[in-house]
Amino acid sequence: MNSAVKYPELKIKLESYDSTLLDLTIKKIVEVVKGVNIKIKGPLPLPTKKEVITIIRSPHVDKASREQFEKNTHKRLMILVDVNQGGIDSLKKIKIPVGVTLRFSK
């Protein structure tokens, strides 16, 4: 494709259950983006989604005995400004670890 094609703004939304893994992925993306000379806004922390699950410990009676588990989904938003096709190609080459979800939007 033509490398002169530009997108005025490209939003990357990252989600993960592990915040350290999410931060390492963000560092990789920032290094690649700075190497291609693309302006970057962020990473902006978004609200963490907290999901609490309560189960009864006993299989029979004793409903007062319960156990709670929680699952936190950490989210970040990065906005890339004036992205060309070469920048998008370099973003596609990044190895994203298992457990991190990326979503791109204009």
UniProtKB/Swiss-Prot annotation:
Pfam families referenced in this protein's UniProt entry, alphabetically: Ribosomal_S10 (PF00338)
Signal peptide as annotated in the record = none
Query: What's in the GO CC field?
Result: small ribosomal subunit
Keyword match Zinc:
no
Q: Name one GO biological process term.
A: translation
> Which InterPro entries did the record assign?
Ribosomal_uS10, Ribosomal_uS10_CS, Ribosomal_uS10_dom, Ribosomal_uS10_dom_sf
Which PROSITE patterns does the record cross-reference, listed alphabetically?
Answer: RIBOSOMAL_S10
Q: Which GO terms describe its molecular function?
A: structural constituent of ribosome; tRNA binding
Provide the alphabetized UniProt keywords: Ribonucleoprotein, Ribosomal protein
Question: Which PANTHER family does the record associate with it?
Answer: 30S RIBOSOMAL PROTEIN S10 FAMILY MEMBER (PTHR11700)
Homology family: Belongs to the universal ribosomal protein uS10 family.
This chain's function reads:
Involved in the binding of tRNA to the ribosomes.
Q: How does it assemble?
A: Part of the 30S ribosomal subunit.
What's this protein's name? Small ribosomal subunit protein uS10
Species assigned in the record: Mycoplasma genitalium (strain ATCC 33530 / DSM 19775 / NCTC 10195 / G37)
Gene name per UniProt: rpsJ
